[in-house]
Amino acid sequence: MTIKVHHLRPAPGAKTTKTRVGRGEGSKGKTAGRGTKGSKARKNISAAFEGGQMPIHMRLPKMKGFKNKFKVTFQVVNLERLAELFPNGGQVGPAELVDAGAVRKGQPVKVLGTGDLGGVTLQVSAHAFSASAKEKITAAGGSITEL
């Protein structure tokens, strides 16, 4: 027999009816499971109240400082990666790096000086360069352009 949606039933005991409290003298009537007297028996008590214990929101440290909304985060590319991606040399800019899969588009690019160019001559244009990257590119006979 195939199972059909209209044959499905919840497991026995899976669905229980909600207990209505404070309705008559039976179970959960009168005091509705709150005991007698005291602040917890009366109107409302804060969800953050932990019975006099120092609450978690006061035990945790305050977050210090602020987030600078003008901060520029660069995508970094090292010289060794440039030498891998462009072994024949030539023009290298953000568009070429996006096409090569080295960076994502829409964010500024910074070239860092880790690794060696291995004699590859590159004309690199990027938004920022480290000092060591500038030295190594120009020493290999290439040129740099800051965008």
Curated annotation (Swiss-Prot):
InterPro entries: Ribosomal_uL15 (IPR030878), Ribosomal_uL15/eL18 (IPR021131), Ribosomal_uL15/eL18_sf (IPR036227), Ribosomal_uL15_bac-type (IPR005749), Ribosomal_uL15_CS (IPR001196). Keywords: Ribonucleoprotein, Ribosomal protein, RNA-binding, rRNA-binding. This is Large ribosomal subunit protein uL15. Binds to the 23S rRNA. It holds the Pfam family Ribosomal_L27A. Disulfide bonds: none annotated. Part of the 50S ribosomal subunit. Belongs to the universal ribosomal protein uL15 family. One of its GO terms (biological process) is translation. PROSITE patterns: RIBOSOMAL_L15 (PS00475). Residues 1-42 are annotated as: Disordered. GO terms for molecular function: rRNA binding; structural constituent of ribosome. One of its GO terms (cellular component) is cytosolic large ribosomal subunit. The gene is rplO. SUPFAM superfamilies: Ribosomal proteins L15p and L18e.
